[in-house]
Amino acid sequence: MKTWDDFLAAMAARHAFFAKAGCVVSDYGITEVFAAPYTEAELKAIFKKARAGKSVTAAEALKFKSAWLFEGLRADAKSNWTTQLHYNCLRDNNTAMFDKLGPDTGFDCIGDWSVTENLARLFDRLEREDALPR
């Protein structure tokens, strides 16, 4: 995958794979609600920069994560899936169980970061584009 458009196509292919397998619910385990404004031109430039092995700024990374989340939720809405946002997730915080079972095996916890503003921004944009999932 070389371009932003390739990335979007890969996301769509994975979504279709899970839909074909009978999936009707998605769960996004995210550290925070990503909802920074961005343009498609910015995303193409950010993706190109990262693919060239150059470091992206924190602001660029946030724009990319915001677009990734938005596109995933848009696909969920299009497929009439139910979406769970597992936000403020602190992953793999039990070292003994991580060593025994590996990553993402259920030993996570929820943090106490503020999310209201970003959640409202994300849901409003999804609603305006008729892409708010269940």
Which residues fall in each region the model found?
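Histidine/acidic residue-rich metal-binding segments in metalloenzymes
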Residues: M1-P133
